[in-house]
Amino acid sequence: MAGHSYWTNTPLEALRSIRMQLKDTLDKYNVQFWQTETCIMGNDEEIGGGGGYDRTMKTALYVARIIHHDIVYAGARSWQWWRAIGGDYKDGLLREYTDPDLHDGKVEDSKLLWILGNYSRFIRPGAVRMSIKATDKSGQVIPEGDTDPQGLMCSAYQNTNGQWVMVVIHYADQEKNFTFKVDGSKVKSWQGYRTSDEA
């Protein structure tokens, strides 16, 4: 089944509950789900709605949170954005500036482009999402600890070549330390990639 994530992102409680209801229904009928289109709309008030191009992390993190919830809670097997190039709106990964005669111009990238790349570049077709559990310092499991929609959100995947990928979204302004381990598997090395307003 294909669907769109428009108008399902606010309030935060609905972001998760709508996707969990969808997943329950999909599982009942043994149907897979592809999220085939979304962009920033007027109801996305947390980031000022869809008007005005934003190349910063504000929009990028907002969309990363939607991707995380679509994959983790709705079980989306594929995820697509609305369009690649746009004008003065939050709907393009790239912002185009053209002269009136359309003979010259420039293109500017956004952090949204790079956030999407953290998924599409590293999580390859055929990858399997792995379970994650968060624990406190004493080792006690924190229910839903892998998803704090205003803090850390984590998901992990194993590609068909055996490579592991972990996507960590840090929504809060404060620094947050965490450690991770992979049970039952020997990992020789990890390579980190960071997307931020500075990098």
Residue ranges of predicted features:
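A general structural signal for short secondary-structure junctions and capping/turn motifs
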Residues: 23-26, 68-73, 156-157, 182-185
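Extended hydrophobic-aromatic, low-complexity segments
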Residues: 13, 44, 90-92, 167, ...
